[in-house]
Amino acid sequence: MNLPDLNVTCTCVRVPILRSHSISISLQCEKELNLDEVKESLRKQKGVIYYDDLVNKKYPMPILSSNQNNVYVGRLRKDKVLKGGVALFCSGDQIRKGAASNAVSIIKCL
């Protein structure tokens, strides 16, 4: 293609998996976010494990999140396509932390 100004954000995911769902998320925000502040906020969230160390090849994978209630989040980076965008990757056990258990968690908060 030879398009030096073409902005692309991508995530590689390998399958098959035994359990747990994963999702690549791109968020568009009204303003640019400081990634260090986003990381710190994610680390403080109950039920979230911020797991992101690309040097040591540690990032969210289905095998890590299987059989637990925590959701692993990582691969946080600026989205090069969306203005004010952030991209991240999440993995969580769909049986332990799926729609039904999330509904129960929300009801408890209310």
What spans do the regions from the language model cover?
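NAD(P)-dependent Rossmann-like dehydrogenase/reductase catalytic/cofactor-binding core
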Residues: 70-73, 77-110
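C-terminal substrate-binding/catalytic lobe of Rossmann-fold NAD(P)-dependent oxidoreductases
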Residues: 1-87
